[in-house]
Amino acid sequence: MTLKEKIDSFPFWYHKIDIGGEVTPGWAPLNADNYNIPDDLTGKRVLDVGAWDGYWTFEALKRGASQVVAIDDWSDMPYAKDAMITKKDYEKRTEWDTFDFCKSHLGYTDDQCQRYTMSVYDVEKLGMFDVVFFFGALYHCRYPLLALDKLSAVCKEEIYVETAVCDDYSAYTKTIGFGYGNMGNVVMEFYPTDELGYCPTNWWSPTMQCLRTMLASAGFNEIEIWKFMEPKVVAQCRGFAKGKK
């Protein structure tokens, strides 16, 4: 079986990962440069929360990280009404199957690259980290501020966050341009069922200013925030934040 055939044998890919010249058929990240991750992570111990197929885990290792610990609790359900996979196909996958496949082909050792099925609320079991990645996961947390508190407690240097934001879009108006960001509002929109993206694991989306104040409340300083872009579609309504300890 060729490498491409092996890649295609998996029922679902979330990330686009280059392994040996073949790129896995996911869709994320939409633009990796927008995350503003340091080019040099030499010697850093990194935590990747919500790792999925492992794009950011392997990217940190490429940039010199001495060890990356990836966690996911697999609570997200990409077979929501607007997703590109059925529930039947999603349930065919095995936890960490695509991650382990990529890790093997990229040649990383167990010491360099560890992964655990774990809630973000339990990260203290893993020790301290220089850098934390928290991408595409905040809005899946029922208790988002608690999640940031937990991550702050294990972060020695920097955290990078990417999340859905409601500055330019409300799931209740369903129109781009009708959000909460124009007045710098510090608000968070709550989704009790599947209002955002028809996905029942999407609980919240903050405004950019709310994201900033949440990081500050969790103990981070020198916080920077930036949008993914001026959105034209809902998938582009994303925001980033960086905080230091």
Q: Which ranges hold each PLM region?
A:
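Conserved alpha-helix/loop element of class I SAM-dependent methyltransferases that forms part
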Residues: 22-44
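S-adenosyl-L-methionine-dependent methyltransferase catalytic module, highlighting the catalytic core
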Residues: 120-125, 129, 142-244
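N-terminal, positively charged/glycine-rich alpha-helical extensions of SAM-dependent methyltransferases
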Residues: 1-19
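Conserved class I S-adenosyl-L-methionine
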Residues: 44-52
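Conserved SAM-binding motif I beta-strand of class I
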Residues: 67-73
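A conserved beta-strand element that flanks and buttresses the S-adenosyl-L-methionine
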Residues: 133
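Conserved SAM-binding loop of SAM-dependent methyltransferases across substrates and taxa
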Residues: 53-65
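S-adenosyl-L-methionine
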Residues: 88-124
